[in-house]
Amino acid sequence: MTREPSELDKVADAWVDKMAELSPSFATYIGRKGSDHLLDDPSPEAIEEHLAESKKFHAKVKAAPVADRVDEVTKAAMLANFELNEELHDSGVWKRDLDVISSPAQGIRDIFDLSPTDSVEAWENLTKRMNSVPEAIDGYIRTLRLGIEAGDTPAKRQVEFNIKMAEGIAAADGFFNKFAESAKAGDSDLPDTLKADIVAAGHAATEGYAKLLEFFKGDMLENANSVDAIGRERYALFSRKFLGAKIDLDETYEWGREELARVTAEQIAVANEIKPGATVAEAIEVLNNDASRKLHSKDELQKWMQRLSDNAIEKLNGTHFDIAEPLRKLECMIAPTNSGVIYYTGPTDDFSRPGRMWWSVPDGVNEFDTWRETTTVYHEGVPGHHLQIAQQVYNRAELNSWRRLASWSSGHGEGWALYAERLMADLGFLDDPGDRLGMLDGQRMRAARVVLDLGVHLGKPKLDGTGTWDFDYALDFMGKNVNMSPEFVNFEVHRYFGWPGQAPSYKIGQRIWEQIRDEYKAKKGADFDIKEFHKTALNLGALGLDTLKFALLG
């Protein structure tokens, strides 16, 4: 049965319309037509305009009547979101918005991965979008200059990393030039005149990043902050942003240390199953030398991901989850970038672009270990991000556009994905000791993130008691707690230093999901059904974790 939209739903829908107008990237992400030729504007003026519109809708949401329980949850979620975003703006952090993964320096390029490329019209739009890159870069530089004027700048380490990133994009064989030169409308060639325009636009976008590179190497590097830590006050804001919940930061740090020790002990026990008496490192060596667990090309990786994903959907549907037909298509993709990141992008509103799992393979890497990555497919796909996000988009019967398309909390989303990994182990999908060790390897990394992130940004003492956390200590600590290449570990630690509060949201989010499930189970007593809990929780959409608790437990 479809719920009749309330007055609050209409306000929420109008806010999504305004968000799509203010952010063409958001419009592209959700499949909203009409702005695929535009780019987000990261200039100070655009940021202030976005804040002003946000405040208008904040007031409208606050004044809107509440018709039912769905409205109660919507109102709680939207008010929390508006209030926090205004606090973050007032803190001034937007003037120093530069990190290695989520800032405009990456976002201006990243949206091209999701832009339609299947028609002449799509490439006409992409030509205009690429030609907009220099203007977007200019606006972004002006925003960062405000931070320089205020003496509030990103850490030097983040600037240095972005110099390397910008060098790659600004090179003659950088992303935009290669993207333009390979342009096709699906399998069809484009008209010569359009092709020439596309190549010229690729050059223009490349020149835009050359200007950003010049700024990074000059004024930005000269004025960069020598201090990596964001500090307790701002960290508390970022923690709330990524969790949608207020937590005791010091208690969570101590819990993180305990959780890291617990997962490590569990790893040691599984290592003994793989080879009696083996250390974790020795068990990993056994797995890495097992030819049956090897993939030898990007093509093999893509096909393996797709098979594993399709099998999970088939086995889970109708047994542990009810997976609607549009959700049963998940495309596993090799990304056009080489950062090493594995990520998920949700479907468009009409599912014309399905949910996609992306693997960004570093240059020179052509061998992959299935024991390590089986759990990753479940994390990004089903029952992880794809089931969660695509179900949210699908639930038109109950949720307004904001709840379906725009509401997101890392603690909810990443916490669910880690919860889903453990669930797959509980359901028998990771009974193979190698695959289970891979899951624990990921869980250990996420627990280590809690300790490192809080330790660095709160200025905690090093675990050995010698001074406070710094980059070299963090790099060594992370290297000892993950079984990944030095290049990957280096990227990850740079990420944590520049994106405070995000990395711990995975494990902390999992913790809160499990706490909510256990409280829900206690409340239901003998009537508790885990399948019903998952369905009820996922049908709510991605809420901040405090709001999720309110929605499920009252």
Language-model features: where?
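N-terminal maturation segment of proteins
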Residues: 1-554
